[in-house]
Swiss-Prot record:
It catalyses: GTP + H2O = GDP + phosphate + H(+). It is a peripheral membrane protein. GO terms for biological process: positive regulation of translation. One of its GO terms (molecular function) is GTPase activity. This is Elongation factor 4. GTP binds at residues 16-21, 133-136. It holds the Pfam family GTP_EFTU. Transmembrane segments: none annotated. Its EC number is 3.6.5.n1. Disulfide bonds: none annotated.
Amino acid sequence: MDKSKIRNFSIIAHIDHGKSTLADRILELTNTVEKREMQDQLLDSMDIERERGITIKLNSVQLKYHSKDNQDYIFNLIDTPGHVDFTYEVSRSLAACEGAILVVDASQGVEAQTLANVYLAIDSNLEIIPVINKIDLPSADVDKVKHEIEEIIGLDCSKSPLISAKTGLNVEDVLQAIVEKIPSPSDAIDNAPLKALIFDSYYDKYLGVVMSIRLKQGMLKVGDKIKLMSTNAEYEVTSLGIKTPKIVKKDFLEAGEVGWVAASIKTIKDVNVGDTITSVLNPADEPLDGYKKLKPMVYCGIYPIDTNKYQDFKEALEKIELSDSSLVYEPETSQALGFGFRCGFLGLLHMEVIQERLEREYNLELIATAPSVVYKVHLTNKQVIELDNPALLPEAQKISKIEEPFVEIKIATPSEYIGDLMNLCQNKLGIYKNMEVIDNNRRILIYQMPLAEIIFDFFNKLKSISKGYASFEYELIGYKESKLVRMDIKLNGEMVDAFSMIVNQKFAYQRGSALTLKLKELIPRQNFEVPVQATIGNKVISRETIKAYRKDVTWKLHAADKSRRKKLLEKQKEGKIKMKEIGTVEVPQEAFVAILKIDD
């Protein structure tokens, strides 16, 4: 194979800037997919991806392109997720490429996530082609967007293709730019020791785990003995090939190619994205750079509403885990919610997507507790424990300090919302770092703040303040000590473990008051009075009372029969005291959802 005719590239963009639509047009123009098989967002395989208009799972496809210089080229398009939760996957798929197409919406301009992904591409030394999309919109301002890209990112836009991916206008210019500007895989050597980067994996019920790979050097054939360098696990290649986007089997793959390989691997946990495949007989000395083990950043408890569906829920998690190695879970029991699982996710979007897939694809009705981050708890006996479940936090006297994860957040916003967004960040314990100018009307705010404050309703407030115009991205910068306490909720004197949360001391009173008030509204009245208390240790910081129903036991008495009336009321009072001692309070599902929505 002539390596000079190969082009490996990704498309990067902010959500809704037209990445998947451009991919569709490229598939059409190169006749990769027949017109009758074409559908919108073809590379987005899940219904959730199409409905939300986002890419979650990576996809790759090989295309053939006949260029203007009468040459035939092979393009490998590696589709990438655009959301901050999946940054590591984006970085690995970019590492499989030599170039990237940066798609920017002509009416929106440069957004926070655009910057995040561009910097990843720059870190991978990729050739970046800026493409300005949606030029057919009435609100498009091409010159302004060109200026933004040149000023903020430093890319020359004088020859940028100006396109409409929706109508197909000028998309041919993008294909020609790929040929002219993106380099071929020049370092690809066939006779060197095998090195292949795993940039994605999924489970197939016939083949087992299928790994999406980019061969950096060496060759790979069916029957070869291979080794995964992070675990030293050895396997035999059973089949390999390329995607067009259909699965096409081949006998071998060469250096510089992008394809897939299966080796009878049973579970996806055995394969790590970013790992290097090498040969058992002639192994490489060093793995490829950039591999790291992914750790969940956000945890929550998920429980089936119907307790009889526990086994179905467990099987559904096992099936989803086959195609998503970043999901972690372990069994958990709650006094309030019964049997369920403590699940770990890469971020809030990842959590929502997994929950939605469980409910949709497996017909389950689920309830989730408030999300929590991983805290580092330093005990007085010098031990350090990592904790993601607030209910398991030790007593205050055993703790010397608690550290929580901090992130650096970049918010791209129109200038008019800056004051309100700065207030929001300060209310979320943000530390101001910098403000960068995009143009006359847009700025980038840079803050450092606790991750726990971002997962707690930050996104909704940001969108509400900016009327949807602001966008943000964040990255973990490490752990810092904070004044944190565990707040519990007691109903009728009994602690409800599913309501426990770790909060900053500064917010404990407001959140306690807001939550007790919300629960008072949502929990139905009982036949006895129910106190709703927010507590820190033994101290009650907020209390509301759900009044009892008052049954009129005296309705059939004569007005003059005062002693009988008094006797009946005393009896009712005794009954209520007894009922309160043995009575349990039914908590409706809405109450568990309310904990996610309480306002500061």
